[in-house]
Amino acid sequence: MNEIVGDLWHEHAAGAVVAITTNGMVTKSGKSIMPRGCARQAADRYPELTRLLGSLLINHGNHVFDLGRKLVSFPVEEDPYRNPEMRLIEQSCRELVELTDYKGWQKVVV
């Protein structure tokens, strides 16, 4: 792991997979709630993500998912209006490592 400072989307454009910090909430219409930070930026860039992630959350729970487009969800909280949960962050770290190994990704930026 290397710590870098920079723009997630610059790294994404350069070929890195970007892990988007997310929560487990879904609207009545089945869309994930992506209200701020890199989740909001991703939803603004790729509007279909809210429906895709919402469907995955409904069917599989709050986990790391390959969302396509070199994007993955990285759950940090169950509810966007509460503090991030260490238990969930640890789970997401384990799942991201497994997915990265499985996919053979060379660079993932969180």
Please identify what each model-predicted range represents.
Residues 1-109:
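Macrodomain-like recognition of ADP-ribose-binding/processing modules
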